Structures are given as C-alpha cells and as structure tokens.
C-alpha cells in the first residue's frame, strides 16, 4: 500500500473441510486487519464463508472456477463476487457478451503467459507426473517438459518437436485495444514460477 499497490490474497484452491473449519478465517484475518483489498477464491464454500466473516471484503472469482460465460458469472455476482477472472479459453466476443450481460462485474483476463493444455486447475497430470496437485495450487507444469512420442516401438517426433504437450505462450499485446474495448477491467499476467524481474519487466511493457 505504501508503494501505491493493491494487495490480493490468493485462496484460489480447493480446500479440505478441516482447513475451512480450522484454518481459513484465522489465515485471512491478519491480512484483513492490515487493509487487504480482495481475496481470490475458487471454492464456493470458501467464498460464502469469507463473505460471512468479512462482509465488506471484495471477492475475486479465480480462473480456477472455469468461468466461460455469463450464466456462471451472474451467479457469482449474486453471491457477492465483485470480479471474475475469465478462463483463458474465452474469445473476445464471449468476453464482450459477458460484459454486456454483467455490466457491473469487473472482468479480469489473462494477456500474457503460459497456456494450460487443460482448463486451469482441471488437470491431474502434475499429481501423477510430479506428485504435486494442480488442483491444490501446486502444479509442477509437467506439460512444459520435453517428451519422446512413440507409435508402437518407433519414436515419431524429433528434438525440434519434443514439447508435445506444451501450448504456445500467450502474448496479447497486438490486440490490447480490442481487449479493453471488450470490457476487460484488469489485465492478468502469469507470474507462477516466474521471478520478480520477469514479472516487473513484462508488466512495464503492458503499462
């Protein structure tokens, strides 16, 4: 806050019952008492509980909620969410329609970073491949690794085509005016597993 920045607390993961009952509120309260601006959530139960204990706290619906249209976003608005982070898979036309249908809800959309080959947080590959659950916010990004692809006993890809599961990264700079015109309120730049220098530089380019 002293640097003129807003503080958003990430609770955008699926929580177990014992975590919700015994840890959630005590975890959030110190941040709230120091002026926390918003909490980013995935779990609907978590969202409702936060609104109960901190009724004036802004709630941002995480991309982990997989909101791909207006109906779900309207429900989230009715439940008290002020902002929705859209799925990366949404088109500009769909985002514009969301803005039209939910004009009071802030829309945040990804503009730069990795593209998951699944819907965000709807993947078990990291659990199987790296022992870390993407559904619990600990994705090891095994889809970004190099793989050999076989058809029966014959390898069918070479070293120049070894990233079989890695989607091309997103860079929305060329269409930034269109994104803003569609009604996007906040631009989201992926920071997971990135260092501060990278995040600062990319942010400065978009600013």
Predicted regions and their residues:
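As written
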Residues: 80-81
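Active-site pocket-lining/capping segments in soluble small-molecule metabolic enzymes
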Residues: 1-67, 85-89, 94-186, 193-207
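Conserved nucleotide-cofactor-binding alpha/beta core module
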Residues: 70-71
């Amino acid at each position: 806050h002293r640097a003129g920045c807003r503080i958003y607390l990430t609770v955008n993961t699926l929580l177990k019952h014992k975590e919700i009952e015994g840890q959630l509120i005590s975890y959030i309260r110190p941040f709230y008492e120091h002026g926390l601006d918003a909490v980013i959530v995935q779990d609907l139960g978590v969202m409702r509980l936060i609104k109960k204990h901190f009724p004036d706290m802004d709630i941002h619906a995480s991309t982990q909620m997989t909101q791909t249209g207006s109906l779900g976003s309207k429900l989230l608005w009715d439940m008290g969410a002020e902002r929705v982070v859209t799925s990366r898979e949404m088109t500009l036309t769909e985002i514009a329609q969301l803005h039209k249908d939910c004009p009071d809800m802030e829309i945040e959309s990804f503009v730069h970073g990795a593209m998951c080959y699944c819907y965000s947080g709807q993947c078990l590959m990291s659990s199987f491949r790296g022992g870390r659950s993407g559904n619990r916010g600990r994705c090891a990004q095994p889809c970004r690794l190099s793989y050999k692809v076989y058809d029966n006993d014959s390898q069918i890809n070479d070293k120049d085509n070894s990233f079989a599961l890695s989607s091309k990264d997103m860079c929305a700079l060329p269409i930034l005016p269109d994104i803003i015109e569609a009604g996007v309120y906040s631009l989201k730049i992926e920071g997971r597993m990135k260092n501060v220098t990278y995040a600062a530089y990319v942010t400065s380019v978009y600013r």
